[in-house]
Each structure stands twice: as C-alpha cells, then as structure tokens.
Amino acid sequence: MPINKIGTTGKRDETMGYVKWSYETLNHFCGDVFKAFGFTEEESNQIKDVLLTADLYGIESHGMQRMVRYHKGIEKGTIHPQAKPEVVFETPISAVIDGHNGMGQLISVYAMKKAIEKAKKTGVGIVTVCESNHFGIAGYYAKMACDEGLLGMACTNSEAIMVPTFGKKAMLGSNPIAVAMPADPYPFFFDCSTTVVTRGKLEMYNKMEKPLPDGWALDKDGHASTDAPDVLANIVAKKGGGIMPLGGNEEVTGSHKGYGYGMLCELFSSILSMGVTSDHCCTFPDKTGICHGFMAIDPAAFGDPQAIRRHFSEYLEALRESPKAEGKDRIYTHGEKEVFAEKERREHGIPVNDNTMVELANLCGYLKLDFGKYFEGYELPKDSKFFTGNY
C-alpha cells in the first residue's frame, strides 16, 4: 500500500496541472528509486533529503523533477554512483576535494561537514570541490552550517546557461550562491541563482507548456525569447543563447551585476579548485566537471555568538516591521517563506506537476519499479508529450 496521508490518489488541482502527495509517499518513492540507481540505503536517504527539502521549500525546479536527469547522467556515465570524494589538498582552514564524478549531493555533504569541522576548530573552514555533479539547492549546505550555529555559504558552477552582458553565447552557469545564519524566530536563509532564473525553472515552464516571461531568456542569435523548448534545446546543443544574468541583458538594468556575481561564484568553485569552468562543464563524454565552494564561519571568532545572534535577530525584526508600500501588508526576510512553505506542505502535501509524474512513471518502467505501488489510483495523462508508454 502507498504511504500517503493525503489520500490514495492525492489532491488534484486541475487548473494548475498538479497533484499533491504526502511527504511520506514521496520520501518512500525517492528512496526506492535511488537504491535502484545503485546507491546504498544511507546514500539514498541523503540524496532524497536534499531533493525533498527543495520541494518542501517550494523550490520545485530542484526537487523530484531532477530525478530523471540524474538517471540519465548515470546511464551516460557522467555520474559514477560508486565514486568517493578524496581530499587532494588541505590546510587547517581549507581543503580541496576531488569528487571523482560522484553524486553531487553526497560529495557536497561531505565537503560542508569538513568545512564545519574546520570552522569549529579554527573559526573558519573553506572547502572547494572539483569533478562533481549537480548538487541540488545550494541552500541545503549553507543550512547545514547554520544548524550547527555557524554562518554557512555554498555555491556551485554548472553547465553554461548564462549569457554574459552584451553576449549571445552562454558562458557561465546559473551559479547560485546561498548564505544561512542562525537567528530568531527562524534563521536567515538566502539562496538564489545569479541568472534571472535557473534552467530548472525553464524545465518547469516547458512541462507546464507555458511561454517564458519576458526578460528571462535569449535565443541563439541573442534576441529575447519566450520559447522554453527552443531555449532549452539550444542550451543542450550548445547552439547559443541561454538565460540572462540577474538584471537582464542591459547595463542600465544591472545586467553587469548579475554577471559579476556569477563570476564570484566561479572564483569560489572552479578557479580555487583548479576545476572545470562553466563554459566547459557538461562537454565531456564521461563527466560533467561541475565544481562547488563551501564556507563555514564561527560567530565566536568575532565575539559572543549569542549576542551576535540577538543583534542579527533584532535587525531582521526591524526589517519586517519597517513601513510597507501601499497595498502591501508584509515585508519578508530571507528564509521566512521557506519556513511557511515547509509547514504548509508537510501538512497538506507537496505538489508534483502531471508531466513530472509522467516522467517518474517512465522512470519506474525503466527501473522495473511498480509506479502504482507508490501512487495508487493516479491516472497518467496519456496525451502528455513526456509520455513514452514505458511504465
């Protein structure tokens, strides 16, 4: 029987094209899928926790919908399930880790744990990683440090999707940066790409069969585009075009700032690790070459950590209580919405797009898993362009 507290068929929203499933249902399903991929139970538990945290936080672009891409990476040979991370350079405050093309989530948890360990001993820990893979949401790893009472930072490069200001060819990844720090009543948690949106967001619009909003993407000739399938195809085929930096594609709107933030991420990931830069990521037959950067800082290196926490919490409260614009009744600080989303989704279910459900059914067919065991009563939309009949 499916482990589903929401109901045997989930809760459907016909207008939005998704169905809600309980956390328990998705957790059970993801664990079995990753074990079928070749990971141990412990490894599967870690990987699925990163993915489902994204879904709980409302970051669906980096949650379950990524599973098919991970499977494709394993099948292609760019993700090596048996690989183990190796420290290749180390000092009391720093380390460089070679991920040997393993699963990004496993490598990244290992790396941030090492950064945390160093920070607790010396006040700061900085770890860079080369030869890894997509690691999910950067914020997961920043939050690991935060949960230990530290200030955490995480970033990664990725397959080139960002077109530099005044350019027409993608040269940088989405290159997200995340920072988390303890505060009350909930921690500060900031996680964003340095592109206007991530590739995962384009994939979600493609699945919803909706045009992209203006100001997100460029076609292969450097012109603005709202065609999600075309932009995605050009990114994969390296034909040109991609996603705009934060600030769009003009200096007057701040494009150079997003471009610059993307470069900062590149510095802390691929450059310090002597790894593969974004423009070459995912161009090899047997690896992606993705690189990461992690940092943990102990507030005790600057004074009384509890006093610092109170000081920060008071400032965050002042921000929330500052004057609101006309028609607005709330100012959020970073991390609030994730707290609220997690509470809502644990209580009322996690939405999964119908086309993602179709992809997962296809995946179950390939892995010889019984899709209906996990999602009893769910009726697949046979007219979906993602349907292969392999389930």
Locate the predicted segments by residue.
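Secondary-shell segments that build the walls of catalytic and ion/ligand-binding clefts
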Residues: P211-C281
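Acidic, glycine/proline-rich low-complexity segments that act as flexible tails and inter-domain linkers
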Residues: P2-Y23, H28-I47, L52-T53, E60-P81, ...
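Catalytic-core signal marking the mid-to-C-terminal active-site face
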Residues: I6-F29, L267, L272, T277-Y391
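A generic, well-ordered mixed alpha/beta core segment in the N-terminal half of proteins
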Residues: A95-D184, C192-S193
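Active-site cofactor/substrate anionic-group-binding motifs, chiefly glycine-
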Residues: H62-I116
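Residues forming anionic-ligand binding surfaces in small-molecule and nucleic-acid pockets
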Residues: V88-D98, V109-G125, S225-G247
